[in-house]
């Protein structure tokens, strides 16, 4: 009977020892290891490595350096290049070249050619022609013919009105 009680006590002791061992070993140590190893160290590494380092790397590399490069390269340099090349060069080339070519060249050519030539040709020649031909000639001829017609009409009217008087005067002269 005592041996049975002793074996039960040893069995209970072994169970308690194993439970405590499993409890300390498995639950506490691995949890701390998992906590420290997995959660703390990798989180710090991930935080420092990925978030801070990579963040600084990304910021410096992508945002700051390329933005400065893009700013200087794309916005400033090409803008200055495009500004100088397109606006100033092309401006000087196009505006002064084309301006002088088109506006002065075409202006003088077309202006003097069309406006002065056409002006002299159209306005002076046809105006003088039209003015002299139609207005002066027609005006003079119409004026003269109208005036002549008016005088003839006055003479005819005077002759008609004076016909009886003339006839009476002729009859009396015969007597």
UniProtKB/Swiss-Prot annotation:
The keyword Repeat applies. It is a multi-pass membrane protein. Residues 59-78 have a biased composition (Polar residues). Signal peptide: none annotated. Residues 26-88 are annotated as: Disordered. Keywords: Membrane, Repeat, Transmembrane, Transmembrane helix. The chain crosses the membrane at residues 3-23, 152-172. GO terms for cellular component: membrane. It comes from the Eukaryota. The keyword Membrane applies. It is found in: Membrane. Residues 24-151 are cytoplasmic. Residues 1-2, 173-175 are extracellular. This is Uncharacterized membrane protein YFL067W. It comes from Saccharomyces cerevisiae (strain ATCC 204508 / S288c) (Baker's yeast).
